[in-house]
Amino acid sequence: MALLQISEPGMAPAPHQRRLAVGIDLGTTNSLVAAVRNSVPEVLPDEAGRVLLPSVVRYLEKGGRRIGHEAKEQAATDPRNTIVSVKRFMGRGKAEVEGAANAPYEFVDAPGMVQIRTIDGVKSPVEVSAEILATLRYRAEDTLGDELVGAVITVPAYFDDAQRQATKDAARLAGLNVLRLLNEPTAAAIAYGLDNAAEGLYAVYDLGGGTFDLSILKLTKGVFEVLAAGGDSALGGDDFDHALFDHVLAQAGIDAKTLAPEDVRLLLDRVRVLKEALSSAPEAALDVTLSSGAHLAPTISHDTFASLVEPLVQRTLTPTRKALRDAQVTPADIKGVVLVGGATRMPVIRDAVAKYFGQPPLVNLDPDQVVALGAAIQADLLAGNRGTGDDWLLLDVIPLSLGVETMGGLVEKIIPRNSTIPIARAQEFTTFKDGQTAMAIHVVQGERELVADCRSLARFELRGIPPMTAGAARIRVTYQVDADGLLSVFAREQQSGVEASVVVKPSYGLADDDIAKMLEDSFKTAEIDMRARALREAQVEAQRMLEATQAALAADGELLDADERAQVDALADALRAVAQGDDTNAIEAATKALADGTDEFAARRMDKSIKRALSGRRLDEI
C-alpha cells in the first residue's frame, strides 16, 4: 500500500506565503546551495544527504555529462574531459591561464574568454559553471517544492568586472534569476554577524580552493559596512596541493612534464588527501603507482609541509596588510577574525592568522558553509521575505579602481577602490586637437598608472562633438557601479547634449549572441537532461520501496503464508533486477507492481498495530 508522505510541522512549502530564493556559493573546489526555512538559514543536501557538491563536470560523447561526486570519482581516469577548479578560468583569456599549474586540458585560443576542448566539443568556463549552478538549482527546487524566484550568488571580493560578468552569464545559462552578486567575505560576515549579534571591527580571511580574499568590516547594529577589501584571485588551496605535488615529484626525480594527464590528476587527488591528513596528524604517507610503473611512497611531516607552503602563506598576508592600511586600522583594532573556505582548516593557516592578528581566529561556524548561509539570508531579504529583526543594511565596496585612458596611455581613476557600492562618479574631460569631433572612451580597471598595466573593460566612442579649439569642449564622463559590482559608463558633451553610453561587457565576458547560442544548445539537450533526471528519480523511488519492503518483511513476515511471501520476494527481485538499469518505464512499472502486490500485507500490518494498541483496554478508555 502506497503511503502518503506528510512533512514535519512548519516544514511544508507555502509558495503563496513566501517567495523562494536561495544563496549559492559557487566555489573552486565545492559548491553549496542554502535557503532560509522557518527563519533559519540552512544548507540544502542532495538525496544522499551530502551538502557539498564537488565543482567538477565530466563531458561524455553525444551530449552526456556527469556533475559533482560522480565526475570527481572519474577525474583521474578521464582528466582531459573532466573539468575541475573551473572558477580559476572564469573571465580569463588564454594567455592568463595557459600556465595553469599541471592543467591537463587543451585550451582553445578563441576570441574572448579561454575555452577548453572536450570529447563533447569546445566548452567555455561559463558553460561548465552553468552545469554546476543548474544542478544546485534542481536540488533547491526539489527540496523546497517549488520554482525559485532568484538566487544570490557569491563571488570573491577581488573578482574583477570580467569575472563577475562571467558568473552572471553562467547563472543566466543555468536558468537562474540573479538577485545579487555578493562578495564572499561579506556573505560570511552576514552569517556570522546575525548569528552572533556581533559588533565592532572584523576581518574576514577567506581562502578557498582557488581564490583568496581579505575584507575588513565594521559591524554595528543593523549595518554591515565593508571598509576595505584585498586579495588574490589566483591563490587558493589548489596552490598548496601543487606545492606538495612538486615536492613529491622532485624527491622521486620525476619531471612533471613527462607525466601523462591521468597521472597528474591521480597524483593531485592523492596529495590533496595527504594535505588534509596533515591537518590532524604530525605526518602522513603517500602511496601511489603511476602508469609508468613508478611507485611513490614518501612520508611527509607537517613541518616539511609547513616549510613548503610558507611562501603561499606569506602571499595571503600581503593583501591582508594592504587592506588594513586602506581601512586605516591595525591588527590590534580587530575584534575578531572570521575564517572562510575549506583551506583555512590547515593548522599552518590558523597559526599564521593567530600570530598576525594576535588572537585565535573564530571557528564556530563551518568555513565550508558560512558563505552560502550568508547568501541565503540576503536572498531571502531580497525576495521580499522580510521578517522581525531583518532591518539591516549592507554596504559593500568595489575591490579595484575604475578609470579611463587619457592621452599618453595614462589612467585617470574615476572611482577609487574600496568605494561603497552602488555608486556613481563623474569627471569632465576635454578634446586634444582643434576641431576634434569625436572622442574614444577606453574603460579600464586596476591600480596601476599605465593603461598597459591595467585590465581593459570596454571601449566606445562619443561622436558629434561640435568643432572647437582644443580644450574648449566639455565632456562629462559618468561611471555607475550597481550593487552587483557591474559597471555602466555614460559620456555627454555639455554644449550640444550629444551622448553615448555602454553597459560594460568585458572583452572576456560573453556576447549576447554567445549566450543565446548556449541557451539554444541547452534547449537541445533539455530532453536528455529530463530523461536522466526521470531515471534517477525512478531509481531512488525503487530503492526506497525495496528498503521499506525488506524492513516490513523482517518485522512482520509471519503475516504472510509461504505462497504470499514467495510472490512478494519475486516482485522485489524483479524490481531489484531493473533498478540499476536505464529503462525508466521498466523501473516505474516494477515499483508499482511491488507496491500493488504488498497492499494486502500493508493492511494486515495496520490491523496488527491497531490490535496491539487496543489490547487490554476497556471501551470507555478509548
Curated annotation (Swiss-Prot):
This protein's UniProt keywords: ATP-binding, Chaperone, Nucleotide-binding
One MF term in the entry's GO annotations: ATP hydrolysis activity
Q: Name one Pfam family in it.
A: HSP70
Q: Which domain of life is it from?
A: Bacteria
Provide the transmembrane region boundaries: none
Which GO biological process categories is it annotated with?
Answer: iron-sulfur cluster assembly
Q: Which InterPro entries match?
A: ATPase_NBD (IPR043129), Heat_shock_70_CS (IPR018181), HscA_NBD (IPR042039), HSP70_C_sf (IPR029048), HSP70_peptide-bd_sf (IPR029047), Hsp_70_fam (IPR013126), ISC_FeS_clus_asmbl_HscA (IPR010236)
SUPFAM superfamilies registered for this protein in UniProt: Actin-like ATPase domain, Heat shock protein 70kD (HSP70), C-terminal subdomain, Heat shock protein 70kD (HSP70), peptide-binding domain
What is this protein for, i.e. what is its function? Chaperone involved in the maturation of iron-sulfur cluster-containing proteins. Has a low intrinsic ATPase activity which is markedly stimulated by HscB.
Task: Say which family it is in.
Answer: Belongs to the heat shock protein 70 family.
Report what the protein is called.
Chaperone protein HscA homolog
